[in-house]
Design a protein with these regions (language model features):
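Extended lipid/amphipathic-ligand handling interfaces
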Residues: 33-38, 60-68, 89-91, 95-98, ...
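Gly/Pro-enriched, hydrophobic low-complexity segments
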Residues: 148-226
Length: 235
């Protein structure tokens, strides 16, 4: 009778532990990284995003069109405490020239000054491209899929190493939520918290990155680009 009870209790506990443990679907994880690679290889896209940290936030609007000649329009807004600067930095590429509007100071130059040619194309770097499927799956501790939305618990140790391989970053929690449509990412949120220690001084880390990505067919540039001041060697 004791043996029977022991078996029953063992089975019961095993079922409960299995129910409480985090589930992980490697196919869903690989689907995310495949979608990430497809997204990074897009020839055109409009990207709206925010980078929120403990005491500040960046608002980003980037438009990239490079089916023919490279065109770029990007805008960065900055929020620091109660200070808000919506047009902190605006940058454009058009007709082989670059245009910069930094808080009202407008200058123009040529793309060769930033290491590009007139017919250059931008290539996004995929830091996960050389990892095996097993290594990619190790980056997440759990996964959940509901329709087109994928939710992952990120391995904090591996993410900390990606952020800083010197070992100064220690993370307590990290999650990633992504919406995948047509094998491409349309929306993504990454949150992580922890601490960073440099020279015995520690600072809390509380970061949230949110991106929305959609198709782009045309960029509407400001109509005063020709009036931007030409950069000189002294500038």
């Amino acid at each position: 009778m004791k043996k029977i009870l022991t078996i029953i209790l063992t089975c019961f506990l095993s079922l409960n532990l299995a129910g409480c443990s985090a589930s992980k679907n490697n196919d869903d994880i690989l689907a995310f990284f495949n979608a990430l690679d497809n997204t990074l290889n897009l020839k055109s896209a409009q990207i709206n995003g925010t980078l929120a940290m403990k005491d500040s936030k960046l608002n980003i609007d980037a438009q990239i069109l490079q089916k023919d000649e490279l065109q770029v329009s990007s805008s960065i807004g900055l929020v620091a405490g109660k200070n808000v600067q919506n047009n902190f930095l605006n940058f454009y590429i058009k007709d082989g020239k670059t245009y910069l509007n930094s808080m009202g100071t407008k200058t123009q130059s040529t793309v060769d000054k930033i290491g590009l040619k007139k017919n250059s194309k931008l290539n996004a770097y995929n830091p996960f491209l050389d990892l095996t499927d097993d290594q990619l799956c190790e980056l997440f501790d759990s996964s959940k899929k509901e329709n087109d939305t994928y939710t992952f618990k990120v391995n904090t140790s591996k993410l900390a190493t990606l952020l800083d391989n010197m070992g100064s970053v220690k993370l307590d929690h990290a999650t990633l939520v992504a919406t995948i449509k047509n094998k491409k990412i349309s929306h993504m949120i990454l949150n992580f918290t922890g601490t960073q220690t440099v020279d015995d001084a520690s600072a809390d880390i509380d970061v949230s990155i949110e991106l929305s990505i959609k198709k782009l067919y045309k960029i509407n540039f400001p109509n005063d680009l020709d009036n931007y001041k030409n950069e000189t060697a002294e500038d």
